[in-house]
């Protein structure tokens, strides 16, 4: 997963451990991606999964196996456990976070709205995104990528579901608004420096991450019609304030 911004002096500290590089669109293609997602004519739950996957930029299994019980509506948080309760006949449903520590995803107003729409369809079930043919199971691991292919993307060369993480990471970094610690924490990356890892593990940076996730959702909204760079958008906000 490549996540580097020339706008930042990272001093070798901003080093994601995920060495496999997944295809990701350049941020300039955001308006096209958002338009194609809005116009996706397949299953409605799949469209919601696409939208939330981009808003949350979590790993595929973290979203696929998500349960309604993990959503804290009052605090506007999605709390992903390090391990989930195994559901009978659902392979790997015990999987929680990849890093084996609880991960908090602050819910933007946009994410809350989509989750409410999703709840109307699957709120009576365990999984937020149930399978299309068996609602006791979760959506398949290929659902998002299949939808991207239907939307006209080559998931081997242009964009895959994991590529949303690189896009979000690039935008947050290039905006110049957020600390690398808060970005790393929200990306749920493993810090290689053991001393620094212990510090970051204790420091949640939650207040900054709440603001950051709302900024990301607002930034996506800003890009629905034409491309605005993260740095430009951050500048507009500074001028407005």
What are the functions of these language-model segments?
Residues 8-45, 55-58, 66, 83, ...:
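Long, amphipathic, Lys/Arg-enriched alpha-helical "connector/arm" segment
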Residues 48-51:
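Short amphipathic alpha helix immediately N-terminal
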Residues 1-6, 53-79, 178-182:
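Short, charged phosphate-coordinating catalytic segments
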Residues 6-17, 65-117, 191-194:
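Conserved tyrosine-mediated DNA breakage-rejoining catalytic core shared by Y-recombinases
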Residues 19, 23, 87-116, 125-148, ...:
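C-terminal catalytic core of Y-nucleophile DNA break-rejoin enzymes
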Residues 14-20, 110-146, 156, 197-201, ...:
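Major-groove DNA-contacting interfaces characterized by cationic-aromatic clusters
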Residues 16-19, 24, 80-87, 112, ...:
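Catalytic-site neighborhood detector that most strongly recognizes the C-terminal catalytic loop/helix
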Residues 35-46, 105, 117-136, 142-185, ...:
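Short, basic (Lys/Arg/His-rich) helix/loop patches that form interaction surfaces
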